[in-house]
Amino acid sequence: RICYNHQSTTPATTKSCGENSCYKKTWSDHRGTIIERGCGCPKVKRGVHLHCCQSDKCNN
């Protein structure tokens, strides 16, 4: 699986992953809205929006 693994507004980067899914996490703090992307489908804390998907580059 090829997943995006950049954060928020940094230039897009991808990673070849062993997992079959990609994720995109979104949350807000004093810096504003933070977006994190990566491989797999992690558990998240309350208040964090999580989107998991199972195709290449699906987590942009």
Curated annotation (Swiss-Prot):
PROSITE patterns: SNAKE_TOXIN
InterPro entries (UniProt xref): Snake_3FTx (IPR003571), Snake_toxin-like_sf (IPR045860), Snake_toxin_con_site (IPR018354), Toxin_cobra-type (IPR054131)
GO CC field: extracellular region
Keywords associated with the record: Acetylcholine receptor inhibiting toxin, Disulfide bond, Ion channel impairing toxin, Neurotoxin, Postsynaptic neurotoxin, Secreted, Toxin
Single annotated GO MF: acetylcholine receptor inhibitor activity
Source species, domain of life: Eukaryota
Entry comment describing in which tissues the protein is expressed: Expressed by the venom gland.
Disulphide bridges, residue numbers: 3-22, 17-39, 41-52, 53-58
Record's keyword annotation contains Aminoacyl-tRNA synthetase: no
Localization of this protein: Secreted
Main location: secreted
Pfam family, one: Toxin_cobra-type
Family per similarity comment: Belongs to the three-finger toxin family. Short-chain subfamily. Type I alpha-neurotoxin sub-subfamily.
Described purpose of this protein according to its UniProt entry: Binds to muscle nicotinic acetylcholine receptor (nAChR) and inhibit acetylcholine from binding to the receptor, thereby impairing neuromuscular transmission.
Protein name per UniProt: Short neurotoxin 1
